[in-house]
Amino acid sequence: MPVIKVRENEPFDVALRRFKRSCEKAGVLSDVRSREFYEKPTTIRKRAKASAVKRHMKKLARENARRNRLY
């Protein structure tokens, strides 16, 4: 859990914004959302594999676009 020390004469809005930013960097909300419901291990592996395939296809598309620009 991220901890924020409120500085002297610091407005509440600014401290809240810093806290939200640190929570986002730590990945607290995404972790809570992923643990909200039980997910079977096979589903986790399937989703991870699908995201890896998607990343790979995106990388290939980027490389092909770069090659097409060169010629």
From Swiss-Prot:
Per the record, the similarity remark reads: Belongs to the bacterial ribosomal protein bS21 family.
| Comp. bias (Basic and acidic residues) | 60-71
Q: Name one GO molecular function term.
A: structural constituent of ribosome
Lineage per the UniProt record:
Bacteria, Pseudomonadati, Pseudomonadota, Gammaproteobacteria, Aeromonadales
Q: Which protein are we looking at?
A: Small ribosomal subunit protein bS21
Residue ranges, annotated region (Disordered): 48-71
State if Lipid biosynthesis is listed as a keyword.
Answer: no
Matches recorded under Pfam families: Ribosomal_S21
Highest taxon in the source lineage:
Bacteria
Record keywords, A-Z: Ribonucleoprotein, Ribosomal protein
GO biological process terms, semicolon-separated: translation
Bias (Basic residues) occurs at 48-59
* PROSITE patterns hit by this protein: RIBOSOMAL_S21
Please give the GO cellular component terms listed in this UniProt entry. ribonucleoprotein complex; ribosome
